[in-house]
Structure formats: structure tokens, C-alpha cells
Amino acid sequence: MLSVGQWPNKPFAWLLLFLGCSGLLGAALYFQMVLNLEPCVKCVYQRMAVIGIGLSAIVGLFGSGLWLTRWAALIGWLYSSYQGLLIAYDHWDLQTSKNAFFAVCESAPNFPDWAPMHEWMPGLFAAPGLCGDIDWQWLGLGMPGWMTVIFAGLLLIGIIVTICHIISSFTKKDGLVLYHK
């Protein structure tokens, strides 16, 4: 019987999270390289949040048997999802504001001096696009709208998994049961 509370103990669950993040980054690069949609600063920050979730998944994948690495992975997942949600929602709000004058953002990503990612890997982290431009839509939502939905989903799943993991850690039950045979 597989329970949500036991997911952090299973490398396969972390692998699925990593593959999901890899798919999101692959889609971002497809939009950038193939469709020629230039990312803006907020897009790059959202990309970093996805990378943060992916790195947390790698920590969980290789350290799911150890409680410290498992909790570091869960916290990294929750933190990166939350930050990504804030940035994506702010970007979405900026694009849908009535006054286009305020639909601007920084001209270059604000990375730490010790890790200028946009200088080290400009193909991935440079931000020549404008935050207010809506160059792509699907089902009425632009890229920031979809990323808001994705980050909200990742955060919600992360919260549920973490709560179930806490409950299953303090009880003899397996946590929230997904199915019965």
C-alpha cells in the first residue's frame, strides 16, 4: 500500500519531480530557441525557481533514505515553489495591468556578484525580453499565467506531501492512503 506520506522516502517520487522540472526547462528552452520568444527578467527568475525545485529533487533522489537530506529536499521544493509562485503571479499581474506604463522590469537579472549566472550562461539566463510583452497564449493564459498555475500546483502538492510525511512520521499508519488492493 503506497501512501502520500511515504513518497519522500521513495527515490522514484523524487525522480518524477526532477523529470517534471526537466520538462519545464526543456519547454522554456524550446520557446526561447525554436519559437524565438525572448525571456524577460521575471522569466529567468521563474526558470531559477524551477531549477531550485529540480535540484531539491536531485537531493531527494539520492538522499531519500536519510531524514536530513529528505527534509532538505522537501524544504527546498517548498521554498522554490513558493518563490516561483510569487514571481509568476507578479509577472502575470504586471502583464494584465490596465496601465502599460508600469509593465516594465529590470533590464538585467539581479544575481549575486559571486554567481552572475546571466554572464556565465547567457543562453540560459540572459533576459533580453520585456516583462510586459504577451507573445504567447494558450487557452486564454499567457506564459506567466500558466507558470502561476504550475507553481501553485507544485506548492500545493509539496504541502500535502510534507504534511502527510509529518503525520506518517509520528504515527504507525502509512499516512494518507492512495489506493487499496
UniProtKB/Swiss-Prot annotation:
Gene3D superfamilies, per database record: DsbB-like
GO BP term, pick one: protein folding
Top-level taxonomic group: Bacteria
Cystines in this chain: 40-43, 105-131
TM spans (from-to): 14-30, 49-64, 72-89, 146-164
Key word S-adenosyl-L-methionine present: no
Job of this protein: Required for disulfide bond formation in some periplasmic proteins. Acts by oxidizing the DsbA protein.
PANTHER family linked: DISULFIDE BOND FORMATION PROTEIN B
Protein's name in the database: Disulfide bond formation protein B
Protein's gene: dsbB
